[in-house]
């Protein structure tokens, strides 16, 4: 009886110990579970915060890039629009000439049919023709105020055209009708009214006209060496630009002629040396 009681008492103690141990273990586990859950939640929160920060940074970078590209495109478009508007304004401003000569009437009549005046333009002259020769020819038609041959500034040679100033318009008309087409020094000259009344800036080139069949080969070769390819259609547009047509440029040409005659030798020479100018002058007026 005593043995069975002791055995039962031992079983009870072991059960109680196991219960207490299980209870103690369950208490420990119960104590440790909230700490672990808290650490997991903290790690999740930190991860979510880091993700949100990275996402916000990437979003801010994207937005800044978009804003930068938009601002650059806007600035470029603004610059382009400003440059276009500036170029348009510049074209509008400079489309019309602001020179004081543009508002004035520079020509008397048109190039095809100039109005009659006292100044005649003589074109297609030879290099050997002088102002004295022209005066002898045109003085038959009336009193002459002055005769001016236009010379090149660099070479000091005749540019192949001159201006004859009459005192009367009627005499100029008669001289134009009679002397136009006349052969002078082996050249068939052209005579017409001058359309300019003020001098122009000289341009390089010599108007020599068209040689006639009676001129010698040496003279043709000499004259062609200074010809710049002018034809009869350009005698207004090019010849007048170089000479100071019709009412102010003849004095400068006369001064240049005097200086050229005083300082430089005579241009009438040939390949063999100096050639005297004692040649017979003959001009044939136009037959009616």
Curated annotation (Swiss-Prot):
- List the subcellular locations: Nucleus
Q: Kindly give the PROSITE patterns that the UniProt entry links to this protein.
A: RRM (PS50102)
- GO CC terms: nuclear inner membrane; nucleoplasm; nucleus; protein-containing complex; spliceosomal complex
The superkingdom listed in its UniProt entry is Eukaryota
Covalent crosslink: Glycyl lysine isopeptide (Lys-Gly) (interchain with G-Cter in SUMO2): 197
Q: Which residues form the RRM domain?
A: 118-196
User: Which SMART domains has this protein been placed in?
Assistant: RRM
Q: Where is the composition biased (Low complexity)?
A: 17-28
Expressing tissues:
Highest expression in heart, skeletal muscle and pancreas. Less abundant in kidney, placenta and brain. Lowest expression in kidney and liver.
Where Dimethylated arginine occurs, residue numbers? Answer: 241
Q: Which residues carry this modification: Phosphothreonine?
A: 33, 103, 201, 203
Record InterPro entries: Nucleotide-bd_a/b_plait_sf, RBD_domain_sf, RBM, RRM_dom
Spell out the subunit comment.
Found in a pre-mRNA exonic splicing enhancer (ESE) complex with TRA2B/SFRS10, SNRNP70, SNRPA1 and SRRM1. Binds to A3 enhancer proteins SFRS4, SFRS5, SFRS6 and SFRS9. Interacts with CPSF6, RBMY1A1, RBMX, RNPS1 and phosphorylated SFRS13A. Interacts with SAFB/SAFB1. Interacts with ILDR1 (via C-terminus) and ILDR2.
Instruction: Give the record's family classification.
Output: Belongs to the splicing factor SR family.
This protein's name: Transformer-2 protein homolog beta
């Amino acid at each position: 009886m005593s043995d069975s009681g002791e055995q039962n008492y031992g079983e009870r103690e072991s059960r109680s110990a196991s219960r207490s141990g299980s209870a103690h273990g369950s208490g420990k586990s119960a104590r440790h579970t909230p700490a672990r859950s808290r650490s997991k939640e903290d790690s999740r929160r930190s991860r979510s915060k880091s993700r949100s920060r990275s996402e916000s940074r990437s979003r801010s970078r994207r937005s800044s890039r978009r804003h930068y590209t938009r601002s650059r495109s806007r600035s470029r478009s603004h610059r382009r629009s400003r440059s276009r508007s500036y170029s348009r304004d510049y074209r509008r401003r400079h489309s019309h000439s602001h020179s004081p000569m543009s508002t004035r009437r520079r020509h008397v009549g048109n190039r095809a049919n100039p109005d009659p005046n006292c100044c005649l333009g003589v074109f297609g002259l030879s290099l050997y023709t002088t102002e004295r020769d022209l005066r002898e020819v045109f003085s038959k038609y009336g009193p002459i105020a002055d005769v001016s041959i236009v010379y090149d500034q660099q070479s000091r040679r005749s540019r192949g055209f001159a201006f004859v100033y009459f005192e009367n318009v009627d005499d100029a008309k008669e001289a134009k009708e009679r002397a136009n087409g006349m052969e002078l020094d082996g050249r068939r000259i052209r005579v017409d009214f001058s359309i300019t009344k003020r001098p122009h800036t000289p341009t390089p080139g010599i108007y020599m006209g068209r040689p006639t069949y009676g001129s010698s080969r040496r003279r043709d070769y000499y004259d062609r060496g200074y010809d710049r390819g002018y034809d009869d259609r350009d005698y207004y547009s090019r010849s007048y630009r170089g000479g100071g047509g019709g009412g102010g440029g003849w004095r400068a040409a006369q001064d240049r002629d005097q200086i050229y005659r005083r300082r430089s030798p005579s241009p009438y020479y040939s390949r063999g040396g100096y050639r005297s100018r004692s040649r017979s002058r003959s001009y044939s007026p136009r037959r009616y």
